[in-house]
Each structure stands twice: as C-alpha cells, then as structure tokens.
Amino acid sequence: MLQHVTLEIGRDRVDACVRFWGLLGFEPMVAPPLLRDRFVWVAREGTQIHLMPVDEPIVPDEGHVAVLSPDYEAALAALRDEGFELQAGSNAWDAPRMFVRCPGGHRVEIMSAPPYPPWPGEGGG
C-alpha cells in the first residue's frame, strides 16, 4: 500500500496547494516535530501527501499522482468552481478520469474507478 508521496512546491504555493488537496478530500495534518519546518502534510484515508516548499521545485511534465475520488463528479465540480482546467484522460478501463495541475504545477489524475482487468477490447473475466 502506498503510504505517502512527497511533492516539491514553491514556497509561495503552500496555502493554494493545501486548498487544492482539500477539494479532493485531503485534510491538513500535523507533521512530526522534526519535519514541521520543512513539510506541510495532508491526508485522506491513510494516504498522505507531503508538500515540500523549496526555492526551485522540480515538477515533472508527465509524471503524476493519481487519486481515486469517492464522489468523482463532485470533485470535478469543486475543481471547476475554483477555476482549475481539467483535461480528459483516455478511457483505458471503461471508467472516466481527468487530469489537472495542482497550484504547485504537479499533474494530478482524478479517477472515478481504479484500473483493473479485463481491459476494454480484451474480453474475458
């Protein structure tokens, strides 16, 4: 099970990133004392995102974090209401998904269902 992902973000993007992850159901949590001056943490259902404010964040173009949304349509509506631009992903497993850039620049995939075979076009079960 994936426990956490660390994302570098610009120092001026912390509040905006915490708000963004909140739209996806992640809530702020207190980091351990040893790490509080270097990280801001958010969590949902045992999974954590560790936001690491830095002067020059490294943000991959295509690499991304994927999250399963318990209420997919509500999450998309909340993101749209906040002005985020959504990009449709391919329908690789007969379940809608969208991509968005968080305020820190990272690509985030919002999934309506997890990928699981049988894959479309391959039949079977």
Descriptions of predicted regions:
Residues 8, 66-70, 101:
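Short hydrophobic/aromatic beta-strand micro-patches
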Residues 1-18, 63-65, 117-125:
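N-terminal beta-strand motif that seeds the catalytic metal site of vicinal oxygen chelate
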Residues 82-125:
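Vicinal oxygen chelate
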Residues 47-50, 59, 105-108:
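Short, charged/polar, Gly/Pro-enriched secondary-structure boundary elements
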Residues 63-90:
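Mid-chain, well-packed structural core segment of small domains
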Residues 34-38, 59, 92-96:
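Short acidic/glycine-enriched loop/turn segments that link adjacent beta-strands
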Residues 39, 48, 66, 97-99, ...:
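Short hydrophobic/aromatic beta-strand element in the GNAT-like acyltransferase core
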Residues 8-48:
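Core segments of cupin and vicinal oxygen chelate
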